[in-house]
Amino acid sequence: MKFSPLLDELIQSLRCLPGVGPKSAQRMAFQLLERDRKAGLKLASALSSAMSDVGHCQSCRTYTEETLCPICASHKRGSSSTICVVETPADVLAIEAGGHFTGRYFVLLGHLSPLDGVGPEELGLALLERHLASGDVSELILATNPTVEGEATAHFIADMARRHKVMISRIAHGVPVGGELEYVDSTTLALSFNGRLPL
């Protein structure tokens, strides 16, 4: 059954979100129209503002409305000589939530994937290389995901960074706190044994 053209357009637009199929999009549209039009208008306004005003930090490439994100603009953090390389802005939020890292970030906005046409240019590696060449970076922490693509990306960046004589480290991978060994996959378990620490 077809609805009004505007309702059909709303449902189709909601389907662009990850994990939202036709039924979920339809439920969302009905919820906004039937029960919460005020929230729908607020959502539309926030979405419109974000789409027109949010861009990328000129230093680290995370999302911001300004030229520099708050971390890069911070006198203390922005002048740190340690850069943590991550794949997405969501990774920055996850690390920041832990509260243990006090350096700068560099957001790749993806990972190397030649089959998908994603190479060094798409990841902004020329900008990262300029940061390394400036002489202001003493350590590069590679925090890409522990996937085949993430590992390949980390190795590519490590090779690039070695030319600039900076310390290169990789975040540890292993058994999660509170996890049970019987549920951990064999690759993670192998990484845990290889990366074990003395007590």
From Swiss-Prot:
Domain Toprim, chain residue ranges per copy: 81-176
Gene3D superfamilies cross-referenced by the UniProt entry: 3.40.1360.10, 6.10.250.240, RecR Domain 1
Alphabetized HAMAP family for the sequence: RecR
SUPFAM superfamilies in alphabetical order: Recombination protein RecR
Any Pfam family matching the protein: RecR_C
CDD domains linked to this entry: TOPRIM_recR
Function: May play a role in DNA repair. It seems to be involved in an RecBC-independent recombinational process of DNA repair. It may act with RecF and RecO.
Similarity section: Belongs to the RecR family.
PROSITE patterns tied to this protein: TOPRIM
Keyword terms, alphabetized: DNA damage, DNA recombination, DNA repair, Metal-binding, Zinc, Zinc-finger
Name used for this protein in its record: Recombination protein RecR
Zn finger residue spans: C4-type: 57-72
Any one Gene Ontology BP term: DNA repair
GO molecular function: DNA binding; zinc ion binding
Source organism (scientific name): Shewanella sp. (strain W3-18-1)
